[in-house]
Design a protein with these regions (language model features):
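Positively charged n-region of N-terminal signal peptides that target proteins for export
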Residues: 1-4
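Catalytic-domain carbohydrate-binding cleft regions of carbohydrate-active enzymes
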Residues: 21-420, 425, 437-439
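Sec/Tat signal peptide C-region and signal peptidase I cleavage site
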Residues: 16-20
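Bacterial N-terminal signal peptides
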Residues: 6-15
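Solvent-exposed beta-hairpin/edge-strand motifs
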Residues: 432-444
Length: 444
């Protein structure tokens, strides 16, 4: 009576073996394909060229690809560029918004501009993110979750801390490939995928994206040996791979997008994922559960042109720092005037001034690597913001001063300390007098 049962089990086992042989092999290696069209706001051209040509090319070409290829996902950074799209190309901008809602056009980078992250103050860097996120919430009903800087000249140890405290989870770039000297051995990176720890111990995930101008010509990427080799460089058996174009915007080539689409449907050993710039980071949350992730605790600096960038165009560095200091001082005075009920808070004016000069913290602008023509626009905007901040500061301090009891013998002088702590320093005051006095007494 047992024989039929044994035979039946044998038949089932054979059937299962045959089914396993005919099934697709399990794909253990993953490739996150991140499409981008990096656009330098100013470099070998000025901002007018960017708006008239490169922003339009980026918008129109990617709308075409999104309509033609159902698996295509495009990533683009910089709130100021989206604002230009809205202002100059409103019809196409509405189409873009529809693709954002469907998850096909991804808002990357979180910030108002893809800025340098070494020269700006921490206040500027955080405000850059806040201004970007505010724009994205208002326009698209969403926020970004990553720092997306494919082309930037070094990354300070503060960046993971800033990102973490702004609610961001990951950071990607490809610029460290440009280094002359390795971090250790022959590697120019601490790792391809892992955790980057900031100065306060905060961690975000770090991904090296490789060359953002990478192209393929209508191949099945699930069989691509180069990509498969890159997955073996991480303990995750995974690669995070930029593809597209750089500097002048535009879009990935049709052959590249077609290759990704074929790879998604392919039978090779690689799982091809048409990815947003933050998908990999989200897939590995919470990071505490991934002990296999290597950890880097330090700064990621460039040793090539990055060094010269921090001495070039000194006027830009000066104007930028003056705006950072004056903007902060103006806001403190405006808050005091508003709190005392003396004057309304000029939020719109202050935000406008911050946006105007933060846009010039772009990594080819503030760093001093753009053509002379570009700096005609940069200096103009820096000076406009200085004037605007100065107006707010003067009006706010003046309003507060008018409410103070200054009935004293002699000439009353009001000092405003914009810092958050007491200061002992030398102050200069110009006073009117009928003739040069023999002496001056100062009373507190």
């Amino acid at each position: 009576m047992k024989l039929p049962v044994i035979l039946l089990a044998s038949e089932l086992l054979c059937s299962g073996s045959m089914h396993a042989q005919s099934a697709k092999p399990e794909k253990k290696a993953k490739a996150y394909m991140v499409a981008d069209a990096h656009l330098d706001t100013q470099w070998n051209w000025d901002v007018q060229t960017t708006i008239k040509e490169y922003v339009w090319n980026t918008l129109s070409r990617n709308l075409f690809l999104l309509k033609k290829y159902p698996d295509y996902i495009f990533n683009f950074e910089g709130g100021v560029k989206y604002a230009w799209m809205k202002e100059y190309f409103p019809s196409e901008y509405e189409q873009l918004k529809a693709f954002v809602r469907s998850g096909r056009w991804h808002i990357s980078g979180s910030s108002w501009e893809a800025s340098d992250v070494l020269v700006p103050s921490v206040e500027s860097s955080i405000r850059n993110i806040l201004l970007g996120q505010e724009y994205y919430r208002k326009e698209f009903g969403t926020e970004s979750t990553d720092i997306f800087l494919p082309d930037c000249f070094g990354f300070g140890w503060t960046l993971p801390t800033i990102a973490k405290h702004c609610g961001l989870i990951g950071f990607s770039s490809q610029k460290l490939d440009w280094r002359n000297h390795p971090f250790y051995g022959e590697s120019k990176h601490p790792f391809m995928l892992g955790l980057w720890k900031g100065i306060d111990g905060s961690s975000i995930m770090l991904a090296h994206g490789y060359d953002y101008g990478k192209r393929w010509n209508n191949i099945d990427l699930s069989e691509d040996k180069e990509l498969l080799g890159l997955t073996k460089r991480t303990p995750l058996n995974t690669v995070y791979r930029y593809y597209g174009t750089g500097d002048t915007g535009g879009s990935p080539s049709i052959g590249s997008v077609s290759s990704v689409e074929k790879g998604i449907k392919g039978n090779g050993p690689l799982e091809i994922i048409s990815a947003t710039s933050d998908q990999l980071f989200k897939d590995y949350l919470p990071y505490e559960k991934h002990s296999e992730l290597p950890v880097f605790n330090g700064e990621l600096l460039m040793d090539v042109h990055g060094t010269g960038c921090y001495t070039s165009q000194a006027a830009m560095k000066l104007y930028n720092r003056q705006n950072e200091l004056l903007g902060d001082a103006a806001e403190r005075a405006a808050v005091a005037a508003d709190w005392l009920g003396i004057a309304g808070y000029p939020g719109e004016s202050l935000t406008e001034a911050w946006k105007r000069f933060i846009f010039h913290q772009f990594h080819d602008d503030l760093t001093g690597t753009s053509i002379p023509r570009a700096y005609e626009f940069s200096w103009n905007d820096e000076l406009l913001s200085l004037k605007q901040f100065s107006g707010v500061l003067t009006a706010s301090v003046g309003a507060v001063s008018e409410k103070m009891d200054t009935r004293v013998k002699g000439i009353p002088v009001v000092f405003y300390n914009a810092l958050g702590f007491p200061v002992t320093d030398v102050a200069e005051v110009a006073i009117e007098a009928p003739k040069f006095p023999k002496g001056v007494s100062v009373y507190n």
